[in-house]
Amino acid sequence: MSRPELTGHASIFYNAKEAKKYDSSSRMIGVQREITERAIELLRLPPASEKPSFILDVGCGSGLSGKVLEEQGHVWVGCDVSRDMLEVANERIEQKRLSAMGEGDDDESSSNEEEYDDNDVNMQSNSNKNASFGDLMHHDMGTGLPFRPATFDACISISALQWLCYSNAKDQIPKKRLTRFFSSLYQVLRRGGRAVLQFYPETAEQAVLISECAAKVGFAGGVVVDYPNSAKAKKHYLVLTFERGYKAPVGLSDTGLNQVRVDGERRDGNKRVHKKKKNGKTKEWILQKKETQRRKGKDVRQDTKFTGRKRKDKF
């Protein structure tokens, strides 16, 4: 199956038909919810009961990730390059707003009349203090984020960042678009805030390019890879912060990795001693080196009981 990014611009791929399909698929909704919950976990936000966070959702699409933010008590603003996806998101927000106001389905939704333009946020009135509604904006993230400095407490992005690695016009240079996006993100985040951007790199070089562009504008952080040995469950999360010396957390492990660790503990229990290699590259050093490569998004072979073991001397 070809990648959507290779078919053209995101605004063309996510048309009205694809937007409805995207929002009605139970599998897609479940995956989006799981990824969003993981991104919020990596943000390490204070409890919303104490103080709700103001969060920017870049590439918000049909508002599936925004719905999770609302359920956790946070306030959010979403931007996306696809008008059709925003129409679906606005319909859901409008229905929730009418339901909170007690109007239900009696009043007709005016979602089809909404216009989404750059620098124009569709503010939803909120008469119910217990309900939160997302604000939507039609905008291309590759041109930078048009918000005031230090506006947001945090930022999330689900399955959108990799689109900046592809060029659909002569003036769309991936490195420049990535740098422009990260530079503006650095400005709109409040100091002490974080950003967690989940993306699907086609190659290891794309993951390195994204990380380098983020570091160039001043961000600290790294790439967290969940389930690195799974073809379907593998997920990349770029965690960005202002904290110098920040070390990205270790990604979630799959069954295979857990099994290897259990075997390692059993070997320790048997008090098997591994002699240090002459060149200084012990098994611990090799495992640490492989883990570092995984965080950079590179393809690394799975750890086994033979990792770091000396080969037999043969003629």
Where are these regions (language model features)?
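Conserved class I S-adenosyl-L-methionine
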Residues: 1-50
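C-terminal lobe and adjacent flexible extensions of AdoMet/dcAdoMet transferase-like proteins
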Residues: 234-315
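A short glycine-rich, Lys/Arg-flanked "PGG" loop and its adjoining helix->strand segment in the class I
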Residues: 175-191
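Conserved S-adenosyl-L-methionine
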Residues: 219-230
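Class I SAM-dependent methyltransferase SAM/SAH-binding core
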Residues: 54-144
